[in-house]
Amino acid sequence: MMRRTTFREIKNTFGRFAAIMAIIALGVGFFSGLKMTKPDMMNTISNFLDKGNFYDLHLLSTLGYTDDDVDSFAGEKDVLYAEGGYSLDVLYKNQGENDRVLKTMSVPENINKLSLVDGRMPEKEDECVVDAKMDSIKIGDVIEVADDDAAEGEDSSTQDILKVKKFTVVGTVNSPLYINFERGTTTLGNGKIAGFVYVSPEAFDSECYTDVYVKFDREFDLYADEYENYIDDRKDEWESICKTSVLDRYKDILMAKGMTEDMVKDITLDDADGVNYYILGRETNIGYVCFESDSDIVNGVAKVFPVFFILVAVLVCMTTMNRMVEEQRSMIGMLKALGYGKAAIMGKYMIYSGTAAVVGCAGGYLIGTYVFPEVIWYAYHMMYIHMPLERTTDWTLVIGVLAASLLCTVGTTWFSCRYELSETAASLMRPKAPKPGKRVFLEHIPFIWKRLKFLRKVSVRNVFRYKKRFFMMIIGISGCTALLLTGFGINDSISGFADNQYGEIQVGDGVITLNTSIAGDREDERFSSLKDRLEEDTSCYDLVSESTWDLVHDGGVKSVNMVIMEEPEHVDRYMKFADKDGAEIEYPGKGEAVINTALAEQYDLKTGDVITVRDSEMKEIRVSVSGIFRNHVYNYVYISPETYEDQMGEAPQYKSVYFNLEEGADSHEISADLMGDAATASVTINKDMKNRISKMMESLNYIVIVVILSAGALAFIVLYNLTNINITERIREIATIKVLGFFKNETSDYVFRENRVLTTFGIAVGLVLGVFLHAFVIGQIKVDMVAFDTYIAPMSYVY
């Protein structure tokens, strides 16, 4: 019988049952979905990189590496694979299309293996596979090396390196080297690489490899600190290995030119002008680095927002079950009078609530962990390669959300039943005595109370007399309002983010990184050729010392960009120093530093505080903070040349150039021209950084939309549930009012007037809570690359 009455109860109160189920499902789905998004994204990229044997070290040398070098590297400690390859930038023409620069590489065998998207791999020298993100080149197209592919300043043209000048596209691929949309810059064409091409190694004609990739036999989790420490140790070891290899190669070249063994035996790399080698880790791969930052942003939202979301859902569920048991007093009393034990009676209501919890939790988890990661991953397709999301299952999370769902429903039901069952059957079968009348606060203010009409006085009394109902409505509505405001606030904080950073704060057009340090001397012969190009191509330029230092303060260490302007009075050409209120900040004087807001907030720094910055050789500079400027991207410490020289005993080494372009100038054409100079190591165009940040923010917009829609759905279900409870528990009161002759609209107004008052209260409280919740959530979205403003637009309060 009890089983039958339980199912009958579910059938008769299916609206309430469905509401509980929906709240649980929405809360669990949102919480679990966002929580599982980063693990799923990480698992997908990790599996892709593992299948492709993504490199651990990338070795470069101006002399290249031979097969003997590669064989030697393969025998070193912990090495699983060492593989040489060819890569160069090539200007192609494509059947009447505009010429474009494509990174052309040899198909790898063991490291950075390609993932075939469509077609097949090259089988002949004149076949190639292309970047799957390049929609303009199709399978079957023929791409041909352009005649004017050699850029000024290059020692040899691609005509000499590539044996084959025309390739037929036979497939499209994804490469572990290019997991996001960035393809890099070049000295050719318009200065931008449009995509990549892989051809057979036999298509190259070179006696040495341009690149060597090394894969170690140790496995670590993606982005793990243990991996970073391991690679740092390996890099130190490989310094001597590469130095020996490059020196031997240099001596072989000299001997091939006629020098004897005795003549070259004492030569060192310091004697070799223009000979350099580089040992690069994954941190130089833009896609790899950006993915960590992007996934951290997702995790920042998922860290706190879903917790508040599920708390609101849990609270409403607990209230609903508590009110339901109170409504069922007569039924509980009757069952008790019929001889049913406490366990049997409790079981009926616990099965009711438990069924709603289990079904809602299961449905919410399955739908949430599918929909939320899928939607967010789809958004990231704008920035990253297309691949199916590979999901993971976190059984700890499954057990946790199920336990929380049961606790807030079954647990509440148990406590409520236990309280009701403590009374006698006769007492339970009688309706609960109404609460004694009390004067409410407004009755003590005659000026207001006397002016209220009778029905409004009744509504005011009811609002404040039934405190459970009051707090239930206030907490439920304010919680949903706070969640909605937070969602809109996140959108306000990220919209216009890139335009603000690269339009109002960083106003320079680009940065050149020099091959050789120029100690503040513009007349240095190493700088003279680049200076001519700069004076022709730019409207202004300034030498800058920009390097990575560690800020050491209060037991913490943070990597920062140390910037020293050669001519500090020119800083406003490239950077606008202003605090959060917009007040201008002066460039720091001797013994002073200006830092960005994110650093100041992280270490609780104020103007006048003393900080220490330390370089890689453990040399330190102590400075007083003279200003804190608004900045969103990266962390900066600005000091004066005098400060550096005073504390380090030498002039700064200026290895960067900030520049601005003339109005309407093509930044990428000028970038290509500047890259053609021997003194230039790289050119960064701020417009490209702006586009990269904008794409990151566009992806985050999808998360915001999901958050707002979910919060809106929760608000709807909560309001439905609370209104349903409010009306159901007042059936007798409504009947009495109708008997007294109230019209239908007056009866409705009597009930809903209270709802409107409580809803207004709840919204007001929710807007205040939303400000704090938004600030808290934004504070949790912390990544090394970006920092967001805590800003809510006025219209968001209206929405």
Predicted features by range, described:
Residues 1-29, 350, 438-479, 726, ...:
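N-terminal Sec/SRP start-transfer signal
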Residues 655-657, 671-779, 783, 787-790:
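C-terminal transmembrane helical bundles of large multi-pass transporters
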Residues 12-40, 354, 362, 468-493, ...:
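Short, strongly hydrophobic transmembrane alpha-helices
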Residues 454-590, 597-598, 609:
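Juxtamembrane segments of multi-pass membrane proteins
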Residues 421-440:
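Short cytosolic juxtamembrane segments of multi-pass membrane proteins
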Residues 5-15, 315-355, 701, 705, ...:
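Interfacial "coupling" helices/loops that link adjacent transmembrane helices in transporter permeases
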Residues 314, 318-326, 330, 354-386, ...:
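Small-residue-rich transmembrane alpha-helices
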Residues 2-311, 323, 342, 497, ...:
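Membrane transport/envelope proteins' first extracytoplasmic loop
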